[in-house]
Amino acid sequence: MQATFFLEKEVRKMFKKNDTVLYSSEGVCVVNDITQRQFKDRIMQYYVLKPVYKEGATVFVPVENKDLVAKMKRILSVEDIHQLIEDMPNQTIEWIDNDNLRKDKYREILRNGSRKQLIQLIRTIYLKQEELKKIGKKIHATDDNIFKEAEKILYEEFAYVLNIHKEEVVPFIFHQIELKEKS
């Protein structure tokens, strides 16, 4: 029990009220509160997250659940985003031919991956999509859904940090890559 208390104290230091975090597939969230709630016969502490781009939504993350808390990541800085964009042209991961293995691996990246892995995932699926388009085919619906989810997570964070609209993220990225290529 004492170890749990230590963990709670340690985790509580990690995030405080009004911190902005990236939380799994919910995207950019503000830590609205750290509260206690009765759950069965015990009181538990929760981070209360408000997704920035999902009006009216609330997410409760138990402070003691280190797996869920691990999905709460500090948002990137402007400098981090520029570095990710600069490295973007070289970022891909291996295309996995087995549909089930690919789905599992790519969903794992969505759940727990770094931003670099998200960029690699987006670029890999995009390149496969373009390759198939040339021969009159399309990617599987599952791959398309994973692609859209990865874009949503990454582009919402970029938009929030850069203080631009989500629709402006892709043009911003292309512009930054263009500038880098010219220099």
Positions of predicted regions on the chain:
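Short, Lys/Arg-enriched N-terminal segments with co-localized hydrophobic residues
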Residues: 1-13
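Loop/turn positions that initiate beta-strands
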Residues: 18-19
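Conserved hydrophobic positions within beta-strands
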Residues: 29-31
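Short, solvent-exposed secondary-structure boundary/capping segments
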Residues: 37-48
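A short macromolecule-binding patch
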Residues: 53-64
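Charge/polar-rich, low-complexity and marginally structured segments
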Residues: 66-183
